[in-house]
Structures are given as structure tokens and as C-alpha cells.
Amino acid sequence: HSTYFVQLGGRRLLIDPVFSTYASPVFFANRAFEGTNLYTAEDMPDIDYLLISHDHWDHLDYATATALRSKVGQVVCPLGVGAHFEAWGYGKETVFEGDWYSVLEGKDGFAIHILPARHFSGRSLTRNKTLWAGFALVTPERRIFFSGDSGYGKHFAEIGARFGGFDLAMLDCGQYDENWRYVHMMPEDTAQAAEDLRARALLPGHVGKFAIAYHTWDDPFKRIVAASRGKPYRLLLPLIGEPVALPIASDGEILRWWEAGR
């Protein structure tokens, strides 16, 4: 869905992990597709930074967060989201909360930037009591961008200009509908956002595990392939668990794994 394990600058980062079989407050809603639950919290090594983009159920999972607690060095999240972690037994000193454009700086030029997104937040009956965000992961050699959930907007071009482009952009590209395109990008928006960000490679996300919209499960893959033709970035569509190594070659064949068995 939107879970990424990243090794960068000698650090291990885990982004929006959801290892549960459902992404909702009840077990019978938003259940994972068969065959997509390949990993558990027990499979994860120690994590230097746990990044959470916002507190929707498909990005912040109680069972996953509590199972990871002993392995996490620092939680990084937008304003208000840290309260969930403190309620779930994380020490306050381990949680870094920030507004848009806040920066958590480490040694050797490593930095995590909390950046704007166009979305909303809330769990159960609460709504918009916490902030939502994307992240830029920066070292002297590499720059990676994660959009979180976001509709298309001018913030992508502004972020691209601010950072001078990215080696890899991991962008929202699923669970969309014309009725809510201001909070979730259509695949064509995702392609434009990658170009705005000056990304050398695009890895579309928010797709492949949960059905939270009305489109078919493979529609995002087909549409992003079409929308990316002629774009200046390389499109990456890995299988769940397939590693992607930086730097990424400028071209390469797309394995259309979603067409297997047809």
C-alpha cells in the first residue's frame, strides 16, 4: 500500500507501515488482498526512524506500531500525530513532531524534512485534529521524496525547486476518484507531480493491497504506464518486497506483473 523500508545514509527508515490484514477500526472492512501480507513487524530489523505521514488507518496501524515499539529509535510525524504514539506506550522523547518545513537533522548531512501535502486526517469520529505531510529524505549524495496521501497541487513544483530534484519520488497513485481528486491524485496527476518534482525515477504507491476506492485494483498500474510515456523520469513498478537500488538507471523494461495469468 504505502509502506516503504528505506536504507539511506547508514540509517534504516520505515514509512507508514501497515502489516495488518485490514486498514480500518473493524476487521471486516478494508481487508488486504489475498497474497499481499508478506511481512510482519517481526520481520523488521531495528529502525532508526519511523515516519508516519498522517493518522488515517491505512497509514497508522495500532497493531503494527505497538509491535514495532521496541525496535524504533525515533518517530517522525506531523503535528498532533505523536499523541497516538505516546498513548500507545512510546516515550515522549522518542517522538519528533513538526509543522510543514520542519527539519530533523542528523550527523553527516542526513536530514528528514516534513513537507506539505494536500489531504486531511482523522480516526473514528475525529477529523482534521492532526496534520498530514510528505517527507524529503536527504543526504549529501541522495534525495528521496515521499508524498504521503495528497491531491495534486503547486506544492510539488515548489518542493522540486527547493530541493533541486530527487533521485526517487514515491507518490500517491491509487484509491482515487473524480469526487475526491483534491485529496488523492489520479495517475495522470501523479505523472505530472513527478515531473514537477524533477524526479529521476517515480515509484507509484497507495496501491496494490487495499481497495478503498471504486476503481479496479490494476487500473492505477495501467494508467500510470500510459501517463508516463515520454516523461523525463523512469517509471518503477516493483512487486511487493522487491528492492530498488539507488542510483537508478535512466531506462529499463517495465515488468507488467499485474497482467500475469490473463
Functional labels for PLM-detected ranges:
Residues P17-F19, D55, A117-H119, G148-S150, ...:
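Active-site metal-binding loops of divalent metal-dependent hydrolases
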Residues P78-R142, R223-E242, P247-A249, E253:
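Metallo-beta-lactamase
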Residues D61-S70, I212-K222, P247-I248:
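Metal-dependent catalytic neighborhoods of phosphoester/phosphodiester hydrolases
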